[in-house]
């Protein structure tokens, strides 16, 4: 009779595209596929270190709802395009970059002036389009971080020296764009009740899918080491209770789900602004939404499933304090 737990002996990595891979690991004892798969997925989505633009100052712009002469996009669209630029910083936690461009044509990520220790993963990404006589002059602050940090959370009250025209951005630091897992049956000799774990992961190119899984595993091991060295301590009297932390992915706006314009507008008409708002709605509730049909509902369900979420989930302490609508 075997008393030791099986560990995966087969690990396969299938590259599906740039930054996209399927990782297969087997065999696991029954139940361990879901136990480890769900833990890795949550860590991959919330705890990977990445880089994102966090503050922008644009010459001639006072706030994000302004427009610029000679620039086809309004400032809101320009900032959305800027968030799509993938930065990678080497041996530093933040940097302020300059982008200056004049004359008709597209403004690309490669037009940003870079020091030697800053890299662009997608230099051909389009930020804006200039018309004849157009000009764009902006300062971009890029920081290192993890997860998703809404701009309103980053507006610190002690910051009294605010620069006029400084725009604070919602920052999505995570280099992991999508991750899902599935558990299939595996067999070893006469045992047929084993698990095979299949992880489908897509990154933005800052790290490879394999490295993302390695890093997430290290985070889990580091956290579990606390339990391995568990020693009881007496709790202080009258210790105040803390509200459970909210998963950062739930604080993201529904726009981050990249739904069709029709679906996104239907959700906003029902005051569904954040992913945390959306997952608490049931299918029947969404189908009662004007102009949102079965096709849009299926699209929403598929996008949520790719992030390990479903409709009809229950959340405590939602919405969290300070969340803007």
From Swiss-Prot:
It is an enzyme of class 2 (transferase). Residues 1-231 are annotated as: Alpha N-terminal domain (alpha-NTD). The keyword Metal-binding does not apply. Residues 246-325 are annotated as: Alpha C-terminal domain (alpha-CTD). Its EC number is 2.7.7.6. One of its GO terms (cellular component) is cytoplasm. It catalyses: RNA(n) + a ribonucleoside 5'-triphosphate = RNA(n+1) + diphosphate. GO terms for molecular function: DNA binding; DNA-directed RNA polymerase activity; protein dimerization activity. InterPro entries: DNA-dir_RNA_pol_insert (IPR011262), DNA-dir_RNA_pol_RpoA/D/Rpb3 (IPR011263), DNA-dir_RpoA (IPR011773), RBP11-like (IPR036603), RNAP_asu_C (IPR011260), RNApol_insert_sf (IPR036643). Disulfide bonds: none annotated. Keywords: DNA-directed RNA polymerase, Nucleotidyltransferase, Transcription, Transferase. CDD domains: RNAP_alpha_NTD. NCBIfam families: PRK05182.1-2, PRK05182.2-5, rpoA. The N-terminal domain is essential for RNAP assembly and basal transcription, whereas the C-terminal domain is involved in interaction with transcriptional regulators and with upstream promoter elements. Belongs to the RNA polymerase alpha chain family. Homodimer. The RNAP catalytic core consists of 2 alpha, 1 beta, 1 beta' and 1 omega subunit. When a sigma factor is associated with the core the holoenzyme is formed, which can initiate transcription. This is DNA-directed RNA polymerase subunit alpha. It comes from Herminiimonas arsenicoxydans.
